[in-house]
């Protein structure tokens, strides 16, 4: 009996000792999660490293995986089904996936779970239109970087709100802040006079708008969305994976 209790105590102690180590390994696995699957060899190792780092950092802030897949061919499978199969096998939770099929020169962007709500068909169309010219010019790194940045930005704006709205632009907010500040200063001088301690920046909303859930300024490069006529075979293409997960989508040629 004593031997049994001795073994039981040993097992319990071993479990408590191993738990912190298992937690560390889980964190490491999360940090090392792959986000770029360049099967078509469109990127250099350095470019892959930069995209992995950007995706991991911005993805952690939005609790969303930003995935990039390039393939020489989908072997006859529709690109939307190809993307859905990937999510069924490897995806979990909120995920955005950009897939490039080099044989058919086709691009597809999909949003799953929370990303399906925040990256709806309309927002994905806007993102795809913005990166289309870079894809056509074989500037793949720039296109993928912009996809991550715009997806990150749109994931911070409540569903149903147009992310291209003029109120979200920094220059409009600056002009509005200066105008409001100028009016306030004029009123104060007219009624009271004295030392002026108010300026335009006093009234500028640094968080852009109350419709934004989370907004920080990690993105260092200025990303401008481009409006271009849609190709005849492009547009919204949401659906459901074979595994039963619904998604938003946008597809087109480049």
UniProtKB/Swiss-Prot annotation:
UniProt lists compositionally biased (Polar residues) regions at 243-254
InterPro entries linked: TPM_dom
Please verify whether the record's keywords include Coiled coil. no
Show which residues constitute the signal peptide: 1-29
Where can this protein be found? Cell membrane
Family to which the UniProt record says this protein belongs: Belongs to the UPF0603 family.
UniProt name for this protein: UPF0603 protein YdjH
- Name its species: Bacillus subtilis (strain 168)
Q: Which gene encodes it?
A: ydjH
């Amino acid at each position: 009996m004593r031997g049994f209790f001795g073994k039981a105590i040993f097992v319990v102690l071993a479990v408590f000792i191993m738990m912190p180590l298992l937690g560390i390994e889980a964190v490491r696995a999360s940090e090392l999660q792959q986000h770029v699957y360049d099967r078509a060899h469109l990127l250099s190792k350095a470019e892959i490293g930069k995209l992995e780092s950007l995706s991991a950092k911005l993805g952690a802030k939005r609790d969303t995986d930003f995935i990039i897949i390039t393939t020489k061919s989908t072997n006859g499978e529709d690109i939307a089904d190809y993307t859905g199969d990937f999510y069924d096998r490897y995806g979990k939770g909120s995920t955005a996936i950009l897939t490039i099929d080099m044989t058919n020169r086709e691009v597809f962007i999909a949003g799953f779970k929370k990303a399906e709500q925040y990256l709806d068909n309309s927002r994905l169309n806007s993102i795809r239109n913005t990166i289309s010219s870079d894809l056509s010019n074989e500037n793949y790194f720039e296109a993928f970087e912009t996809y991550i940045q715009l997806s990150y930005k749109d994931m911070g704006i409540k569903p149903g709100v147009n992310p291209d709205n003029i109120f979200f632009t920094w220059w409009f907010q600056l002009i509005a802040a200066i105008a409001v500040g100028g009016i306030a200063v004029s009123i104060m001088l007219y009624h009271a006079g004295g030392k002026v301690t108010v300026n335009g920046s006093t009234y500028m909303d640094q968080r852009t708008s109350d419709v934004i859930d989370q907004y920080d300024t990690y993105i260092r490069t200025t990303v401008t969305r481009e409006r271009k006529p849609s190709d005849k075979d492009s547009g919204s293409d949401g659906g459901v994976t074979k595994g039963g997960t619904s998604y938003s989508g946008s597809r087109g040629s480049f």
